[in-house]
């Protein structure tokens, strides 16, 4: 397929819209590389994969593809022995998580019997590396930061580091609390300069604290000093930070080495996930356009029902039926230049490119489109200023190139064929070019405003005329395509509507030859009759649709009634059973106690009475109630006919009858697949309206149950408050009436912060310090509402 044609028909704009539905750069890249296929089997497969994606979207609403990243460059670095940073490792882990989720997601669909031959096979290729995924999950977070859980050594280093930092802060805070602080310090804050904790000291008091000056303010009035008392602690902190960095590098190198053993598997998983993203993007794009999967023809047959141009406003675009390849292989659309004829050409051409690219098309169900080896288009003014060619020469150069390449598997779209030269010669050339195109076996749709070509559709058995309807009242085209009706001149009617004198119009009519006038009158009459027939057909179809809907609604209500009845009976039975089981358990306990009393010598308790009471209790259990099976209303046996909608019982799939092979067998179209099916395996159905899918989301808790106490000792202030917030949620979910928060005694800063936070928590009823046995004021007891 020529790139030039893709540009003329604006296929690049379709691809740009399609990229908006991709979830990753991998999906976007696949879309950018998308091109129409010409092999019929390939087109079938790409259409089927899109249909399977659409089926999944209908059933589940979405697929777990979020989090997919292009990691091919990371894998290349591993291949040459390099190490990855934390973010790169996280991205590989994210892809492994998406691989596992996608495989489980697909397995769930396949287990409930959803037919997904292509996507099912694709998911089978995904390899789940759960251990590798989990190792990454406990080692790095989504920002690429290495977690404390990555190694015991790192956890110990960071714990020691936090304690050291707390000691530094506590020492510096003592300076801030000093009674002379307001006099000697510019501000009562602890800050950091050169990665060391400092306090802002006024210039005149710099000798009071000793230590090291790390910075000064712009005015020079404030010095940022590290007091001598914390120099050693800060040095210790720096040493711990160096150890932390060293341990992080070791962890990243270790994980990189372990990932290097799985390069091929991760590479393949990422490629497969990119395919999934691309396929789901096609499916979501089709859903947004209200598009359908077309039937495919390998014989040049096109039958588009209510086809719409996908780049025009969906609320305003006029849908048209376009058919070609059965009764005729050439359509000549005649009429004035303002009639929207070019839109018809572009609609057919663009929908062909979309279908051959595996995309659904904006048309109605049961539309058929042909798979062509070549699509040629001579549309618009492609005049080349560099070559100094005229409009006519430019078009003719293009047409010559087309006729050299065309074959019987080609679709040619000619816009204003023969224009740009003398009308008589132009019309003659147009006829000759159409004949030459037909002789090559091509399917052709051409537009022209030459009246001489109106006769072409009548004089050639392989051709038909068409036109775009024009509304004389509004002086504008309706953009409705009328196949079989040639375009007519509206000059006299338009002139009259615009106020031209009737005398002038009458004189003009007299100058037109009788044959032309009669032809225009005939075309006008034909248009009126066609419009009337279409109106009556639509009304009849609407009435039939209404009757079908009434029948379906009635059958649905009957089914719902019986289902509701059975559900209520089942609920009542289950409730009764629960009550009896509870009573039975209580009775068993009483009987057990009575037997104990009997053994201990109690009088008046007889064994046979206990057995009899237990038997009566067992008989009190409700019996299973048989569900009502609703019987479908009896209908007269249906005589199958071509075009009937049917259900293939053995497959559980819907299809359409194509033709009868024998009394016992039919050819059935199921999606894009044609199959031979036994008549006994068919059930007649009416097409149903698409039902809105209700998406049910289940939320499951995971992880270990919350403990009844939270130990914050050794935690930094900010980290501690975050842990308290998370812990309270977990404790509430676990149902604890009260919990203990251990913060230690220390300076009281952490205790004060925790207390203030708890006072403002909406689920906390009361707080108190622990009793002596509970830990004293180093523990806060929290009671929930």
From Swiss-Prot:
InterPro entries: DNA_mismatch_repair_MutS_C, DNA_mismatch_repair_MutS_core, DNA_mismatch_repair_MutS_sf, MSSS, MutS, MutS2, P-loop_NTPase, Smr_dom. PROSITE patterns: DNA_MISMATCH_REPAIR_2, SMR. Pfam families: MSSS (PF20297), MutS_V (PF00488), Smr (PF01713). Residues 710-785 form the Smr domain. The keyword Transmembrane helix does not apply. Its EC number is 3.1.-.-, 3.6.4.-. Transmembrane segments: none annotated. The keyword Hydrolase applies. HAMAP family: MutS2. Belongs to the DNA mismatch repair MutS family. MutS2 subfamily. Endonuclease that is involved in the suppression of homologous recombination and thus may have a key role in the control of bacterial genetic diversity. This is Endonuclease MutS2. It comes from Listeria monocytogenes serovar 1/2a (strain ATCC BAA-679 / EGD-e). The lineage of its organism: Bacteria, Bacillati, Bacillota, Bacilli, Bacillales. The gene is mutS2.
